[in-house]
Amino acid sequence: MSPVITMGPFHPALEEPYKIDVVCEGEHVTDASIRVGFNFRAIEWLAERKNYTADIALFEHVCGICSNVHTLCLSRAIETLAGIEVPERAQYIRVVVAEAERLHSHLLWAGIACELIGFETLFMACFGLREKIMDVLEAISGNRVNYAMNRPGGVNRDIADPGAVLAAVRAIADATSKQLIPVLTTDATVRARCAGVGVLTRADAIAYGAVGPTARASGLPQDIRASAPYEAYDRLLFEVPVRQEGDVFARVVVRALEILESCRIIEQAIEQMPAGPFRGDDYPKVPAGEVCSRIEGPRGEVFYYVASDGSDTPTRVRVRTPTFANMPTARPMVLGQTFADVPLIQASLDPCYSCTDR
Amino acid sequence: MDAESILHMLDVESAAEHRTDGWWVDVPDLDVRGLATLMRTREVRFVTLTGTPDTAGGYRLIYHWDADGALLNIATTVSAGCIASIADIWPAADWVERELRDYYALVFEGRAETPTLMLLEGDEPGLFSRTSAAGREIDPAVTARDAAEAERKES
Amino acid sequence: MTVVRGLISLLVFPGALFALPAGWFMMWLQRKINARAQGRIGPPFFQPFFDFVKLLAKEPVVRPRLQGFLMTVLPLAAVASTLGAIALLPVFPKAGGFSGDLVLLVSLIEVGPLCAVLGGFVSRSLYGGIGASREAVLTLAYNVPFLIALFALVASAGSFSLAGVALAAAWPVRVLALIALVACIPVKLHLNPFSAASAEQEIYAGSTTEYDGPRLALWELAHALEWVALTGLVASLAFPVADAAWPVRVVVFVAVSVALVVVLSFAAASTARLKLAQTARWFLLCGSGIALSALVVAFVRL
Amino acid sequence: MSLLDSLVRTARRRSPWLFHLNAGSCNGCDIELVACLTPRYDVEQLGIRLEASPRHADIIVVSGPVTRTTLEALQTVYAQVPDPKVVVALGSCPASCNMFAGSPTVVGPLDRIIPVDVYVPGCPPRPDAIVAGIADAVAILCGDVPRPEPTHVPVVADACATGGLS
């Protein structure tokens, strides 16, 4: 009789409630099952009962960490349905905010991952660095979390001081490449905890439908920004980091390199950003129809399906968040690993349970 | 493999429509397991499955696929409330099917078990269907629990 | 006379009156250094003291009688035995008095971790149990180099008495043995990189997960005293000059202890936590290697 | 007031340990609470620590509108924290359910389930507001400020558990 250890729903390793039942032989994991739904607020149900304006605010609260991707994806769905174009300046502003959000999300993740391997000093360093990008987001939107930037037809606020954004982004790129990446990739204790741990093979990544950095660390070069560019991404140069190993260390490396790529994108976007209006005059009227919308969030592909009957309330909004796709891959990853690795492996997916549950 | 060749292989090229958000096609009598196997062998990524009630009292299921970056939306209709499961072919579909059971009490045939995903263990499936009439007029001060309590007092 | 001396070393120096504030000071220093290394300001000076008082003043959770009794007695035993170990430290090797031998000191130091293991099991919490079993595995692992190193000192000094060891051990043996002993301290104090027994992110607070209020306060107290006992053990063995005046001895004893706290804190702040198996392997290979070389040197010299 | 009393009060004021509980929150509040620990805000200066076990805590910080699925765990954790304890409702969700009001799976607001002592408004509150809220909680904890009258009589578990779904 192997003991079943239940982690959660409230566990210090987890910012959010979820349960993972781990079956152990000694310290070795022989089976695991994940239970979600603790954050289930039936947002999709609520969305069918609120108008589009209220829905934008509602979906901002799918997740407090990647709130911008949700409003962006929903706004794009509404724009596609209504057949309206977004002013060019707004497209660039959206890119800047989306990449700034990726920066803060990746730094947050790096911090939490360090905390999980007990490296508190590096956790603090990551969060210290993250405050720089939080300042940028606050300067642009007025908020540290939940930026309320997107609306159908454009963005709500202009970037008043592009120079400050550039300076902050350059400082982050500098600190990342000179301090964060060297420590993460060379420290012996970090390597001992990450390399070869929690491997997701390429075949499993496809079968489980992994997206985002998780898929890219397993050798799948998928990125919506490159494969189906939206907003201004087709006019910006960036690379999609891909690793073949599929272990925790590969996911660390992919995200670290993405931090640098995001800095590059923001720099280009600020420099290329044209003058002009940043939003349309009116809220659009949404005709009947259905539409899908996808963007690349920090954790991977975000998918929205919106169906409208022509009224001011959608008849169905379906959200497939990246963690919903990624989370099942945790099971093949933890099998055969030690119990001490389980929190780190699940964290290496950059899970967001409030996204998953909605 | 690209979306057009897939549509050709499925023999639904003529019915398919290309929109800004990808390819759309309605196949009322879709062989979902055949489709899933084809997609699996061609490495077309399973994106997700959307379920939504249709006006006729049945459900419209849309299988979303990513073929070389292009979105392929293959819709079908479920009138009897059950459809074949593809979770054994695509482990990625496991959670979505469980979720759809929680929301609309749809039955996916061929699964050994369909545990709840979002609801508590032992809850009746079909939360969205059961509560579809509720909450159209939301008073932010009144939560569903108050409504339930009021109902209990009345009865 | 010896009884008076014994009581003084138990209650005054290096015992309770000195050890309590010293333990709190060391805990504060470790947290402060950790905070400064992370670019933070860190806790105020009296923090561990206030933590202790606050915990004492909390209302204990009602528990079944036997469990409640055990959960009070075990941390008390840890406090008492650690205090006893401190009293035995050979700060004044020539002063005579109650001069216990090394075996007694080591067994008293070991009672603390043993109580923690038992305490984790009697708390009937899953995480307490896991923490306790990890603690047990680690105790086995680090005790291999710990005991070999002490044995090397004994072999070199030709005496089991603490004072004898402190005075007579040869320098090459002493240095190697002390390095091995220092490496064992982080395990006992749950410091990085050997803190697997209290890995908050995996098993909550390890064996103390279920302890609350006054009972937790006792564990905190035992923890503070362990700081003094372990750093003190190294400090007293590292300063063997027999005829220094007592104020000099005290100053050196305190200074070496504090220096050790600083070194250990910096090491903890700049490392990640190793897994249980990795920690155990480190002690059985590297730690034991150093200790064994000390032993070899001791025998060759003989 | 005796010397011992004033020592205990000072100790409580200077050593508040928190247990954070996410009852269906969107992460916004939670991440701002974590930000409080980091160099810019550094609440360890005030003796504040985020504890892993509810048994060690003095202050329970709850974020989120309380979903059906977290309800039972919430009540367990509340019972596990030894007295004296203070409950802080972090953000708008535990105060009013925010935009999740009306959802069939939300049973909040928090004060219907456990008594709430301090509300920290905001969606999410900024870290400085969170620190100020914890300071309010500490004042209640050490007895400087009387505990507020409960706004609701907490309801029993069964009535909540079936909320909206029966």
Task: Describe each model-derived feature in a short phrase.
Chain B
Residues 1-155:
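Terminal low-complexity/charged segments
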